[in-house]
Curated annotation (Swiss-Prot):
The keyword Ubl conjugation does not apply. The gene is leuS. This is Leucine--tRNA ligase. GO terms for cellular component: cytosol. It comes from Chlorobium limicola (strain DSM 245 / NBRC 103803 / 6330). CDD domains: Anticodon_Ia_Leu_BEm, LeuRS_core. It is found in: Cytoplasm. Gene3D superfamilies: 3.10.20.590, HUPs (3.40.50.620), Isoleucyl-tRNA Synthetase, Domain 1 (1.10.730.10), Valyl/Leucyl/Isoleucyl-tRNA synthetase, editing domain (3.90.740.10). A motif ('HIGH' region) lies at residues 40-51. Belongs to the class-I aminoacyl-tRNA synthetase family. Keywords: Aminoacyl-tRNA synthetase, ATP-binding, Cytoplasm, Ligase, Nucleotide-binding, Protein biosynthesis. One of its GO terms (molecular function) is aminoacyl-tRNA deacylase activity. One of its GO terms (biological process) is leucyl-tRNA aminoacylation. A motif ('KMSKS' region) lies at residues 576-580.
């Protein structure tokens, strides 16, 4: 009988669906395991082979955990609001809902064809009113807590998309060729900064890749510093700056304020006012990326004003420059050009003084010196000296002196900014707020607030969304008076901030999640997805989860216990897959050619899951041959009958190979080292074939090991060996520890660390016997002759090393 993968895969997918094989158990008696993919945006281009990698990994773990006795929750859904569907609607007039439904259908068919063991009864869609009712509910709780507010802010405005971008989205859009400018708009903003300290501290409790945790730490950007007041001459006011280096105050030679600083224009003297106004106008057209790039040419304008350095009494010129951001610190800095590279470049360009106040190995007029390891110099006055003190002591001494004088105070700052939450588009969750004629805001009392149908999807030239044109939806009245609904919608990130909770209880119409179900299932045990979401989705979801924790909706302080980032699969040309490069490998194509089991195995065998690796068609053909070998363990002849499996005793060597394989595959699967687990199974299959093994335990154990990886062929062979139930309900094989090691081991013998011989011995041979045998290995004896053995080092079952003199 031939291995006809297409018929076999369709057969078992139908059986799984009909029997509800992967439906999540309702009982809470078993230990739980919640394994989750970052759910996809259903784009029109469909899934390619790179998308399948993470989904395959999570499915292997889901199947493995079921076979180990866990109650597994493994769901799938759709992050379906977003710009692409709206842009397609603008071009074609097709409602985004229709486009989204078609795309979801295509995605679902591909995922089902891969044999992924999702519980499809848990499927969710962020555009479903029954779902976004609760997204809106969370927004209203944020509003009631003072964490959602309206503010006039300079936003990142994309001219082509006619919408606002979050700070975290700007780099990607510029890289894609879009134009992004700064523009003042009244926006909804979420106060994520209120949770900055908790978001930072709780990272230490997570089993996440260190690089992702560090990216979040850097984005939050906690810094300890001092706010220092510089008295402005001729103004009778103070200019407050923030610095993390109060120990360098004696070296401050000028101050710089942001173009948006409330004093910026007021600081300008009559002679400088025109130039200052022009500079401020130009700065407002730039994005933060353009303003803060390390390689950008420094620009600035002198205001004509001076401020007094509280440590030296010297007057310092006050400049305006766009490299200072109003959103960080106080929007004003003291510049110490000798010990800060940006300040040094600015001082050189505008011929400003450079004073050494940290002992430097070179002339600071020739090059900046930024080291904290050196000590202060030239840093004393009649009241204080910090010369010669180490950094921490100098910092504290200076901070205490400033506080005592009333000229400064210690403070903690964050680079993290509040989250601009509004979007000027149609295809998003409506924000459930009503604006009344007297200026008051009230919340919608009935949720969900759904989207009306519109004839045109284009944002207006003024920046308002298409909702502003739907009069019947926009205006209304109630007992509080006439109102106008909010026309901004939520960003795409809103629905993905909490979807992992809804998977637990997707049909609940009365509450976001049942408390008992939440306590059982949370938090997510394994979350698999790309590292590109480190400071977007992952940070936003953690923020919302902490808010829900404070509201007693959830019982855990973090949503995702363990995070794993899969590496990217490149095209065969070693480049990232993209339509523009023409190197995209559609998932449907390889599924039709090689089958789901081959694709699953190949993607996991390519290399370590976390590494970037290229697709190679020759490699998947090799995997197909391996599956053919597995098939022939049960169907040895192409057209013949099944093999007769027996209970004959296996040779000890083969028995040990079987148990070593079970142990290795178990440990590697648990650790997501799928490539080495597959390699170990290949070795076992070769050994079974070489020995002509027909032992039932050996063959069935091999099929059980393969089941999480290649479930369709495993189901078919399990049935062929006489079993009536699904292999998906069978326990994973166990190994006997004593058999999971070699009976005879090879011992390396070294003299002073150099290999001089080897010998074979039974595993577990005592150390004294190993030493005695090693002394008498013929090739070793000549290196010991006439030498004093100073030390004998033994690694059991591996090595004996003689240290001689």
């Amino acid at each position: 009988m031939r291995y006809e993968f297409s018929a076999i895969e369709k057969k078992w997918q139908a059986i799984w669906q009909e029997n509800g094989t992967f439906k999540t158990g309702e009982s809470t008696e078993k230990p739980k395991y919640y394994v989750l993919d970052m759910f996809p945006y259903p784009s029109g281009s469909g899934l390619h082979v790179g998308h399948l990698e993470g989904y395959t990994a999570s499915d292997i773990i889901a199947r493995f955990k079921r076979s180990r006795g866990f109650n597994v929750l493994h769901p799938m859904g759709w992050d379906a609001f977003g710009l692409p569907a709206e842009q397609y609607a603008i071009k074609t007039g097709t409602h985004p809902k229709i486009t989204t439904e078609n795309n979801i259908r295509s995605f679902r068919e591909t995922l089902q064809a891969m044999g992924f063991s999702y519980d499809w009864s848990k499927e969710i869609n962020t555009t479903d009113p029954a779902y976004f009712k609760w997204t809106q509910w969370i927004f209203l709780r944020l509003y009631e807590m003072g964490l959602a507010y309206m503010s006039d802010v300079d936003v990142n405005w994309c001219e082509e998309l006619k919408t606002v971008l979050a700070n975290e989205e700007v780099d990607e859009k510029i890289a894609d060729g879009y134009t992004v400018v700064r523009k003042p708009l009244r926006q909804w903003v979420l106060k994520i900064t209120a949770y900055a300290e908790r978001l930072l501290a709780d990272l230490d409790e997570l089993e996440w890749p260190e690089n992702v945790k560090q990216m979040q730490r850097n984005w939050i950007g906690r810094s300890e510093g001092v706010e220092i007041d510089f008295e402005l001459r001729c103004h009778g006011k103070n200019l407050r700056v923030y610095t993390t280096r109060p120990d360098t105050l004696f070296g401050a030679t000028y101050l710089v304020v942001s173009p948006e600083h409330p004093l910026a224009e007021k600081l300008a003297t009559a002679d400088n006012l025109k130039e200052v106004k022009a500079y401020i106008s130009r700065a407002k057209l730039k994005t933060e990326l353009e303003r803060t790039g390390l390689q950008k040419d420094k620009t600035g304008v002198f205001t004509g004003s001076y401020a007094i350095n509280p440590a030296t009494g010297n007057p310092l010129p006050v400049w305006i420059s766009d490299f200072v951001l109003i959103s960080y610190g106080t929007g004003a800095i003291m510049s110490v050009p000798a010990h800060d590279s940006r300040d040094w470049e600015f001082a050189k360009k505008f011929d400003l003084p450079i004073i050494e106040v940290i002992k430097s190995p070179h002339d600071v007029n020739d090059a900046v010196f930024e080291g904290k390891e050196s000590v202060p110099v030239n840093s004393s006055n009649s009241e204080i000296t910090i010369d010669g003190l180490p950094f921490r002591e100098a910092f504290d001494t200076m901070a205490s002196w400033l506080e005592k004088k009333g000229a400064g105070k210690r403070t903690i700052n964050y680079k993290l900014r509040d989250w601009i939450f509004s979007r000027q588009r149609y295809w998003g969750e409506p924000i459930p707020i009503k604006h009344y004629e007297d200026g008051t805001l009230r919340t919608e009392t009935i949720l969900p607030l759904t989207l009306p149908d519109v004839e045109a999807y284009q944002p207006s030239e003024t920046g308002e969304s298409p909702l502003a044109t739907i009069h019947d939806w926009l205006y209304g009245s109630d007992e509080f008076g006439s109102f106008r609904r909010e026309t901004n919608t939520m960003p795409q990130w809103a629905g993905s901030c909490w979807y992992y909770l809804r998977f637990i209880d997707p049909e609940n119409s009365g509450r976001l999640i049942d408390p008992e179900r939440e306590k059982y299932w949370m938090n997510v045990d394994l979350y698999i997805g790309g590292a590109e979401h480190a400071v977007l989705h992952l940070l936003y979801a953690r923020f919302w989860h902490k808010v829900l924790f404070d509201l007693n909706v959830v019982s855990t302080v973090e949503p995702f216990r363990k995070l794993f980032n899969q590496g990217m699969i490149l095209g065969e040309d070693n480049e990232k897959m993209s339509k523009s490069r023409g190197n995209v490998i559609p998932a449907d194509h390889v599924l039709k050619t090689y089958g789901a089991d081959a694709v699953r195995l190949y993607e996991m065998f390519l290399g370590p899951l976390e590494q970037v690796k290229p697709w190679n068609t020759n490699g998947i053909e090799g995997i197909s041959r391996f599956l053919g070998k597995v098939w022939r363990l049960v169907y040895p002849e192409q057209e013949g009958n099944k093999a007769e499996l027996t209970d004959e005793t296996m040779p000890e060597e083969l028995l040990r190979r079987l148990h070593k394989t079970i142990r290795k595959v178990t440990e590697d699967t648990e650790a997501l080292k799928f490539n080495t687990a597959i390699a170990e199974m290949m070795v076992l299959v070769n050994e079974l074939q070489r020995n002509g093994c027909r032992n039932r335990t050996a063959v069935e154990s091999m099929i059980l090991l393969l089941a999480p990886y290649a479930p369709h062929i495993a189901e078919e062979l399990w049935q062929a060996t006489g079993h009536t139930g699904s292999i998906s309900n069978e326990p994973f094989p166990n190994y006997v520890a004593g058999l999971a090691t070699d009976s005879v081991v090879q011992i390396a013998v070294q003299v002073n660390g150099k290999l001089r011989g080897t010998f074979s011995t039974p595993a577990g041979t005592p150390q004294n016997s190993l030493i005695e045998t090693a002394r008498n290995v013929e090739s070793v004896m000549k290196f010991l002759e006439g030498k004093a053995i100073m030390r004998e080092i033994v690694v059991p079952d591996k090595l004996v090393n003689f240290a001689v003199k």
